[in-house]
Curated annotation (Swiss-Prot):
Identification of the protein by name: Protein cortex
Cellular location(s): Cytoplasm
Keywords associated with the record: Cytoplasm, Repeat, WD repeat
Motif window: D-box: 384-395
SMART domains the record matches: WD40
Higher taxonomy: Eukaryota, Metazoa, Ecdysozoa, Arthropoda, Hexapoda
Keyword Lyase among UniProt keywords: no
Entry similarity comment: Belongs to the WD repeat CORT family.
Pfam families named in the record: WD40
WD repeat start-end pairs: 108-148, 149-188, 198-237, 281-325, 344-380, 384-423
Single Gene Ontology MF annotation: ubiquitin ligase activator activity
GO process terms (BP): anaphase-promoting complex-dependent catabolic process; positive regulation of anaphase-promoting complex-dependent catabolic process
Length: 447
């Protein structure tokens, strides 16, 4: 049976095996299928796991009793909490995280070497790049609305902040810029590895500046390039031997964070000149990096130690101050992390390797943290069916979360309740001036 991108999926990994005694998923109504995903299978949670749903309910009930009997001083505890908090956050007061209406298919995604083949534009359009083609799916109409093609196999993709352009990093050192409305290539450029280092590479990571007037690209040869919006070269720099895994431009358009595959190093470069500013060299394996949207340059770094202990570090770029802490019980690997631009909460995708062989699958969790010691929401403990999450992306309004898994599922989650009222979701005072300079200089910063 042919599989198409963004087709609705079944939870069964043997989805095309037919059994005359078992009704197929398509024979049930859509409402019943959605309920079955929420329920999945009942699995006993692991004891002594502080991230279990039972422990979360107990903790909330203890807080309720303490407040009811006035057994603590709220003002004192809140002030201490603010002093110890590693990142700014307005945590939720009740749980919202649940699977939404859509479980879609991502054929061949499990074979992709680099995870960032999924993005969500500001006009509520999801794009999935698979092979040498990309497919666009509308959240409003819940349907596939278009597709486009690249000259070579696509390794990564990213919409510009305005939703007008789509940057595609491809094989054979080529970076393509496509018009979003027409789904056609309008410009392209190449990495300078072949000219300078006599090495053919692939574009493995891409990210836009906050204004969309410039963007960065990393390659499999360990080099990083900055381009203007018109794909004109600004600067090129060779950094490491390993392939670049992730690159992130800071909210104030002054820094570029870079990490490579299977390394313990995070580099901080000035943007867009790509001059070395600072670095973190740890004993961990770096898995994820993301900037906090409410601060000018606060970088979150997710990693895993040799004894399988997940850790996060918060790096204040201007002061070069680093604070790190352990996250969760041992045995969990951190695969992806994001800060919510609505609440400031940190979302982690965790994977337990010892449970990966169990059936039904109980190896993955999505965890929402307000600080390293406080889990305010989670999905996965006591449930099954969620495979390892390789990448995540928020919807423009921050109420939905899209995840791509190794089981080739694209799952849309309810992250926050929908609110039709316009809210101020970003603290612009920290980045207004740098973004103004970035806008005026078309990606160049004069310092």
């Amino acid at each position: 049976m042919d599989r198409r991108t963004f087709d609705r999926k079944t939870n069964n990994p043997q989805r095309y095996r037919l059994d005359r005694f078992v009704a197929t998923r398509d024979s049930f109504s859509e409402t019943r299928r959605r309920r079955s995903w929420h329920a999945a299978f009942d699995v006993h949670p692991v004891n002594n796991d502080r991230w279990s749903e039972g422990n979360l309910k107990k903790k909330n009930y203890i807080k309720y009793l303490d407040k009811a009997f006035d057994l603590e001083s709220p003002d004192k505890n809140k002030s201490i909490k603010r002093m110890n908090r590693l990142w700014p956050c307005i945590p939720r007061k009740k749980t919202y995280l649940s699977s939404a209406d859509s479980i879609l298919d991502l054929p061949t995604y499990s074979y992709a070497i680099y995870p960032e083949l999924l993005d969500w534009s500001n006009d509520n359009m999801l794009v999935a790049a698979l092979g040498s083609s990309y497919h666009k799916w509308s959240w409003r109409s819940q349907s596939l609305i278009g597709h486009g093609f690249a000259e070579y196999e696509i390794q990564c993709c990213k919409f510009d902040p305005r939703g007008e352009l789509l940057a595609l990093g491809t094989y054979m050192k080529t970076l393509e810029i496509h018009n979003n409305s027409k789904s056609k290539k309008i410009m392209s450029n190449t990495c300078k590895c072949l000219e300078i280092d006599n090495m053919n590479c692939s574009i493995t990571a891409v990210d836009w500046s906050p204004t969309g007037n410039s963007f960065a690209a990393g390659c499999s040869g360990g080099a990083v390039t900055s381009f203007t919006r018109a794909a004109k070269l600004i600067s090129w720099r060779h950094l490491v031997r390993e392939a670049i895994l992730l690159i992130r431009v800071s909210p104030n358009a002054r820094y570029l964070a870079v990490t490579a595959m299977n390394t313990a190093l995070v580099l901080l470069l000035s943007w867009p000149s790509l001059e070395m500013y600072s670095s973190i060299d740890s004993d961990w394996s770096i898995r994820a990096i993301c900037w906090h949207p409410w601060r000018s340059a606060l970088l979150g770094v997710g990693a895993v130690t040799d004894d399988l202990q997940a850790r996060i570090a918060l790096w204040n770029a201007p002061t070069r101050e680093v604070r790190d802490t352990s996250i969760g019980p041992k045995g969990y690997r951190l695969d992806s992390m994001l800060f919510s631009h609505r609440t400031g909460e940190l979302v982690l995708s965790m994977w337990h390797s010892d449970r990966a062989t169990l059936h039904p699958k109980t190896c993955s969790q999505l965890v929402v943290l307000s600080d390293p010691d406080t889990m305010v929401d989670q999905w996965g403990e006591g449930r099954s069916g969620l495979d390892r999450v390789r990448t995540m992306i928020f919807s423009p309004d921050g109420t939905k979360l899209a995840t791509a898994t190794t089981d080739e599922d694209l799952i849309i989650w309810n992250f926050l309740p929908e609110d039709n009222k316009m809210k101020k979701t970003k603290c612009r005072s920290f980045s207004a001036l740098p973004e103004c300079l970035d806008n005026a200089m078309l990606g160049y910063s004069l310092r």
